[in-house]
């Protein structure tokens, strides 16, 4: 499909993506454990909470959480994560951003996320033994959470998805799945789905059992897990938005507000934002490692990270992946990169 897209062979790309969806559904049909969907409407059902806790009609019926995994010290993930927390205040003001993290995330990033009122949960030793991409699914085991959305830390939330989420919440369906590219040929994209809590039980146990059986852990293991263990439960009561109708269950996206996010080149839900531009900065002093700073037009530090030096065409450089909103400021000389040598 990648080759078809690069060669602009749209019909072929769509054909093979639809075929892949069909084949993956056949694979998903082998799922043995399927959770039963409650008979009641999800909103009414969650007034008494599917975990068995009773709530008053006028009381706190649990939180709405946007769940992320975050690990490592790359601005490609950390800076987009911080932008998402800021964006959520206007796009999803009633939702709380939560990050499942480990100690590889810089303390400065953790502090900035907390300043923006994000929830930070450090995974424990047992949880840390499963791949980091799976951590965000732990929200499904949290009894305090009413409904959840699973998102990618390196993809910006948007008003397009807000419109889709609103339609889901009004649909009476327990789950929501989105596909927004011809390359989204998976049953559930790991960072593009959500649901009401209480249907799927013991998510951590399901993940551990799956990983014991499937030792071939790779960058899409989380999506394969969702296909093999979760899809059959989800599709019983799901609203699926699918821009290219790759699966027969898909429906078009509703109309949505156009903001600066939707105006980004090649925008689609789930787009890896920091892949659009790699900033290369030459280091003129001989060094192995530097701390670089991103400064705005007023000389204020936006962020700083440590980077190792690379050699390219006889020059010392650092390569930095930054959010589109940052890199565009650098492109037009409004913001700049400075650095100090560490090694």
Each model region followed by its residue ranges:
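Alpha-helical protein-protein interaction scaffolds
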Residues: 1-38
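A conserved hydrophobic helix/loop-capping motif in glycosyltransferases and polysaccharide synthases
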Residues: 66-74
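Short, acidic, metal-binding catalytic loop of nucleotide-sugar glycosyltransferases
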Residues: 83-95
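Short internal beta-strands
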Residues: 96-103
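Active-site-proximal specificity loops/subdomain of glycosyltransferases
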Residues: 103-146
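Short beta-strand-to-loop acidic/aromatic patch adjacent to the donor-nucleotide binding site
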Residues: 145-154
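Conserved donor-nucleotide/metal-binding helix-loop-beta segment in metal-dependent transferases, i.e.
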Residues: 157-188
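Catalytic core and acceptor-binding pocket of nucleotide-sugar-dependent glycosyltransferases
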Residues: 196-333, 337-338
């Amino acid at each position: 499909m990648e080759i078809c897209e690069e060669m602009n062979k749209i019909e072929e790309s769509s054909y093979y993506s639809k075929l892949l969806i069909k084949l993956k559904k056949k694979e998903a049909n082998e799922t043995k454990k399927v959770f039963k969907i409650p008979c009641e409407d999800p909103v009414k059902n969650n007034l008494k909470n599917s975990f068995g806790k009773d709530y008053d009609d006028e009381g706190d019926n649990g939180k709405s959480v946007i769940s992320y995994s975050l690990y490592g010290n790359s601005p490609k993930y950390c800076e987009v994560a911080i932008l998402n927390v800021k964006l959520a205040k206007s796009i999803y003001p009633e939702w709380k951003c939560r990050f499942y993290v480990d100690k590889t995330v810089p303390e400065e990033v953790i502090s900035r996320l907390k300043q923006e009122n994000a929830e930070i949960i450090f995974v424990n030793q047992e949880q840390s033994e499963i791949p980091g991409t799976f951590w965000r699914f732990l929200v499904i085991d949290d009894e305090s959470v009413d409904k959840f959305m699973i998102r990618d830390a390196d993809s910006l939330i948007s008003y397009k998805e807000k419109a889709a989420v609103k339609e889901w919440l009004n649909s009476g369906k327990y789950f929501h799945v989105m596909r927004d590219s011809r390359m989204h040929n998976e049953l559930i994209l790991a960072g593009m789905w959500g649901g009401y809590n209480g249907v799927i039980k013991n998510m951590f146990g399901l993940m551990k059992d799956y990983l014991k059986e499937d030792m071939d852990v790779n960058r899409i293991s989380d999506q394969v897990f969702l296909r093999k263990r979760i899809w059959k439960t989800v599709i019983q009561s799901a609203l699926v938005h699918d821009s290219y109708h790759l699966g027969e269950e898909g429906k078009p996206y509703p109309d949505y507000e156009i903001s600066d996010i939707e105006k980004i080149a090649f925008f689609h839900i789930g787009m890896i934002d920091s892949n659009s531009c790699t900033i290369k900065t030459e280091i003129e002093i001989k060094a192995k490692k530097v701390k670089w700073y991103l400064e705005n037009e007023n000389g204020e530090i936006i962020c700083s990270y440590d980077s190792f030096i690379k050699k390219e065409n006889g020059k010392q450089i650092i390569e930095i992946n930054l959010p589109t909103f940052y890199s565009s400021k650098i492109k037009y000389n409004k913001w700049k990169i400075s650095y100090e040598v560490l090694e």
